[in-house]
Curated annotation (Swiss-Prot):
This is bZIP transcription factor RISBZ1. Residues 238-257 are annotated as: Basic motif. One of its GO terms (molecular function) is sequence-specific DNA binding. Keywords: Activator, DNA-binding, Nucleus, Transcription, Transcription regulation. Residues 182-258 are annotated as: Disordered. Homodimer. Forms heterodimers with RISBZ2/BZP33 and RISBZ3/BZP20. Interacts with DOF3/RPBF. GO terms for biological process: positive regulation of DNA-templated transcription; regulation of starch biosynthetic process. InterPro entries: Basic_leucine-zipper_C, bZIP, bZIP_sf. Transcriptional activator that binds to the DNA specific sequence 5'-TGAGTCA-3' found in seed storage protein gene promoters. Involved in the endosperm-specific regulation of storage protein genes. Can activate the expression of genes encoding for the seed storage proteins glutelin, prolamin, globulin and the allergen RAG1. Functions synergistically with DOF3/RPBF to positively regulate quantitatively many seed storage protein genes. Its main location: nucleus. GO terms for cellular component: nucleus. Residues 236-299 form the bZIP domain.
Length: 436
């Protein structure tokens, strides 16, 4: 099982030693001092400046002047620590473990020529350098967080972080080169990307052997791996259950839609049957309405005919009742029958002329045409046979007609009554009716 160590405790046997560099005096604050010898030590200028500032605060003696005029700082590491580091390097050399480069006791990097600098500017410069180093450390930690959050190994993101870290300046420390597994190379493998640690010189100077993984750590890592695997399995189970629930909900939704569609189809079929029955009833009603309309027209024609007949009957009744009322209005009068007769004969009321209308109602009977009289009443001048009852009756009728004409005030009425009497009945019929 592959173990993960801290960055400052990982020795890399595959790390190639850097090429030797000739010592040179530092010309400014940003120059880097180097030491020649078997162990190459590199330190960024911000680290040297910070160490110098701490030495000045602690009261370290001033640096000695070199023959070329540059100031040489004494080694900040004690002699015992340097000897222990060298012994550890010699003891583990057969294992090809490149752990800690031995710190040289002499030939330290030269300080800048312009040692006398404004303290305010110097402090501002140190603060700026410190901020840059802290930003670099924060980016390095972010790269470690990205690696821990992506268990599948996102090589693209790690390579990007590694390139960013390689482009930054080294952080403050003793300049020991450490190869990390968290920063892959450009081709995806382990590359020569360097991460510096601030307190690496203190830890590796005091440590006499490399750190061995303990069984408890192995158990912890195995437990973490099992927990991670369980988490992955739980996530897979959740995804699988979610998919199954989605399929089940979709199936239920489809079944509900199918049932709803079936109900709608049944309702449509019922509505179609009802519609057809209603259409048949409507056709029957239309047919009955047309037949009733025809019957209504026939009945209206019959009603008009009956109304005409009723009007004719009413006119006939009016004609008869009007003649009777006129006859009742004429007073009873006696007429002498003959000079030779001993007694007078009274005139009866049942005069046949009562059945005819007077002259005023003659215009109402518009459907009866007037006809000329067929006979003339026998003149009273004529000689009458007193023994003949017919002649006597005619004489009485003539006298009665004469009196009626005089009472009505005109001869036209007599002519009309004569015309009606002559058109309806003859003289014999009139006499018979009078005798009855």
């Amino acid at each position: 099982m592959e173990h993960v160590f801290a960055v400052d405790e990982i020795p890399d046997p595959l790390w190639a030693p850097p090429p030797p560099v000739q010592p040179a005096a530092a010309a400014g604050v940003d120059d880097v001092g180097a030491v020649s010898g078997g162990g190459l030590l590199e330190r960024c200028p911000s680290g040297w400046n910070l160490e110098r500032f701490l030495e000045e605060l602690d009261g370290v003696p001033a640096p000695a002047a070199s023959p070329d005029g540059a100031a040489i700082y004494p080694s900040p590491m004690p002699a015992a620590a340097a000897e222990a580091a060298a012994r550890w390097s010699r003891g583990y050399g057969d294992r090809e473990a490149v752990g800690v480069m031995p710190m040289p006791a002499a030939a330290l990097p030269a300080a800048p020529a312009s040692a006398a600098m404004d303290p305010v500017e110097y402090n501002a410069m140190l603060k700026r350098k410190l901020d840059e180093d802290l930003a670099t450390v924060a980016m390095w930690r972010a790269s470690g967080a990205i690696h821990s959050e992506s268990p599948l190994g996102n090589k693209t993101s790690l390579s990007i972080v590694g390139s960013i870290l390689s482009s930054q300046k080294c952080i403050e420390g003793n300049g020991i080169l450490v190869q990390t597994k968290l920063s892959p190379g450009p081709n995806g493998g382990s590359g020569p990307y360097v991460n510096q640690n601030t307190d690496a010189h203190a830890k590796q100077a005091t440590s006499g052997s490399s750190r061995e993984p303990s069984p408890s750590e192995d158990d912890d890592m195995e437990g973490d791996a099992e927990a991670m695997g369980n988490m992955i399995l739980d996530e897979e189970d959740k995804v699988k259950k979610r998919k199954e629930s989605n399929r089940e909900s979709a199936r239920r939704s489809r079944s509900r839609k199918a049932a709803r569609l079936k109900d709608l189809e049944e309702q449509v079929s019922l509505l179609r049957v009802e519609n057809s029955s209603l259409l048949r009833r409507l056709a029957d009603a239309n047919q009955k309405y047309s037949a009733a309309a025809i019957d209504n027209r026939v009945l209206m024609a019959d009603i008009e005919a009956l109304r005409a007949k009723v009007r004719m009957a009413e006119e006939s009744v009016k004609m008869v009742t009007g003649a009777r009322q006129l006859h009742q209005a004429i007073p009873d009068m006696q007429s002498p029958l003959n000079v030779n007769s001993d007694a007078s004969v009274p005139i009866q009321n049942n005069n046949p002329m009562n059945y005819f209308s007077n002259a005023n109602n003659a215009g109402v009977n518009s459907f009866m045409h007037q006809v000329s009289p067929a006979f003339q009443i026998v003149d009273s001048v004529e000689k009458i046979d007193p023994t003949d009852p017919v002649q006597l009756q005619q004489q009485q009728m003539a006298s009665l007609q004469h009196l009626q004409n005089r009472a009505c005030g005109g001869g036209a009425s007599s002519n009309e009554y004569t015309a009606w009497g002559s058109s309806l009945m003859d003289a014999n019929e009139l006499v018979n009716m009078e005798l009855q």
